[in-house]
Amino acid sequence: MSKVCIIAWVHGRVQGVGFRYTTQHEAQRLGLTGYARNLDDGSVEVVACGESEQVDKLMKWLKDGGPRSARVDRVLSEPHRPGEELTGFRIRY
């Protein structure tokens, strides 16, 4: 299996609904490193690194709508090379 990193931007009703916390829980369950943080435009940025199959599972979870309290309208993503070593999956502010 190969290691990959992606950066994704999740748009919709994704702030103020526990989206970052449930994303963190799901990413940790999948053994991924990275972070989730709110952006000023109302979206959430997610960086996820790990085995490609596990990253794909997180992306599917995001595209399927994430937590029940959220409404995901669109998820954009691209390969990413973090400028720092990521340990654990964190919520950034």
From Swiss-Prot:
Catalytic activity: an acyl phosphate + H2O = a carboxylate + phosphate + H(+)
Enzyme class: hydrolase
SUPFAM superfamilies (UniProt xref): Acylphosphatase/BLUF domain-like
Lineage top rank: taxon: Bacteria
Residue ranges crossing the lipid bilayer per the database entry: none
EC assignment: 3.6.1.7
Residue ranges of domain Acylphosphatase-like in the record: 5-93
InterPro entries linked: Acylphosphatase, Acylphosphatase-like_dom, Acylphosphatase-like_dom_sf, Acylphosphatase_bac, Acylphosphatase_CS
Keyword entries, A-Z: Hydrolase
Family: Belongs to the acylphosphatase family.
Protein known as: Acylphosphatase
Organism of provenance: Citrobacter koseri (strain ATCC BAA-895 / CDC 4225-83 / SGSC4696)
